[in-house]
A protein has these predicted regions:
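Selected transmembrane alpha-helices and immediately adjacent juxtamembrane segments
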Residues: 153-186
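Hydrophobic/small/kink-forming positions within alpha-helical transmembrane segments
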Residues: 13-17, 45, 73-78, 103-108, ...
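Small-residue-mediated transmembrane helix hinge/kink sites in multi-pass secondary transporters
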Residues: 24, 84, 110-111, 176, ...
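Specific alpha-helical transmembrane segments that line the substrate/conduction pathway
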Residues: 71-76, 87-136, 188-197, 245-265
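Membrane-interface interhelical linkers
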Residues: 1-23, 27-71, 77-90, 138-160, ...
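C-terminal appended segment following the main domain
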Residues: 229-293
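Loop-to-transmembrane alpha-helix entry segments
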Residues: 99, 115-147, 157, 265-288
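Membrane-interface helix caps and helix-loop-helix hairpins in membrane proteins
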Residues: 115-119, 177-180, 241-242, 292-293
Length: 293
């Protein structure tokens, strides 16, 4: 990875862990994110207005870009719904290590679909990142804790967490393809637009009046998370233009380091020795990815 892409992904990971932290504390329903992505479409309007790029980007958008953007947004919507359902059904220690295993799947799709060639150093680094995340999520070092998520493979939360991991890896590869075809800001705006429509339709099929209730209850939180989510996503898209998507997705798991720190400091989580061990392994993995070609 290039030094600039590493910096961008680290900043993105910090922002990502922050908005995830607020989301977990708030226990927001899926309808909350309709408003997040609606606000996301408005956040980019000043950039388009002052830069004057929007008409040109709109005219240059190919049918392939539109098609892949819609597919990516649908997959991201499925990812978001699956992740929220998983967190609603089970404890974090079961869902987190499975849902954050996306780097393992991403390298498979990246090799098969877009022909990325990964170095041995990079592959080992990705493996250590996943192991580090798994250990961070453990309650302790007993064998029962190690195999706890694996014993739940037939449970609905496991299924939704696995769906989140797979869909997260697929849309990341699609993002990589799309940002090679257009400006990252325009693509990010498209994703916000399409996901807003998709989540709006999903909400209407659930309860017709819930969107108004969600807006009335969480106005400030909606705007804050829209700002943080879009900043994090945009930085990753820019990094994808410079580096391999397999490395970017794996390096983004640095957010687990920040998340563990936030959990210990503000949520008073225990088992800091387990967290620190996982964080050390994760850090070694990140260093290897940073050195990988």
């Amino acid at each position: 990875m290039t030094p600039l892409s590493i910096i961008l992904v680290l900043i993105s990971a910090l922002i990502h862990s922050s908005w995830n932290f607020f989301t977990k504390r708030g226990n927001f329903p899926i309808e909350f994110f309709f408003w997040v992505f609606l606000w996301g479409t408005f956040l980019y309007l000043p950039f388009f207005y002052f830069s004057g790029l929007f008409p040109g980007l709109l005219l240059q958008a190919t049918p392939k870009l539109w098609t892949l953007s819609v597919i990516s947004s649908l997959i991201q919507t499925l990812y978001l719904i699956s992740l929220i359902k998983a967190y609603q059904m089970a404890e974090l220690s079961l869902v987190y290590p499975i849902s954050r295993s996306a780097p393992l799947f991403t390298q498979v799709w990246a090799v098969l679909l877009i022909g990325e060639i990964l170095s041995i150093t990079g592959v080992v680094g990705i493996g250590l990142v996943v192991v580090g995340i798994f250990i961070i999520s453990m309650s302790d070092f007993r064998l029962t804790a190690v195999f706890h998520p694996l014993r739940q493979t037939s449970s609905p939360p496991y299924f939704f967490a696995l769906i989140a991991a797979v869909t997260g890896s697929v849309y990341s590869v699609l993002d990589k393809v799309c940002v090679q075809m257009t400006h990252p800001v325009f693509y990010c705006w498209l994703i916000n637009l399409f996901m807003c429509i998709e989540l709006g339709l999903y909400a209407l099929f659930q309860k017709r009046n819930i969107l108004i209730k969600v807006w009335g209850q969480w106005k400030k939180e909606i705007f804050l998370i829209a700002l943080l989510q879009n900043a994090s996503y945009l930085l990753v898209l820019v990094a994808m233009q410079m580096s391999k998507v397999s490395y970017v997705v794996a390096f983004r798991q640095a957010g687990a380091l920040f998340g563990a720190g936030l959990g210990i400091l503000f949520l008073k989580e225990t088992q800091w020795k387990t967290r620190m061990t996982g964080a050390l392994i994760l850090t070694i993995g990140l260093i290897l990815i940073g050195l990988a070609k």
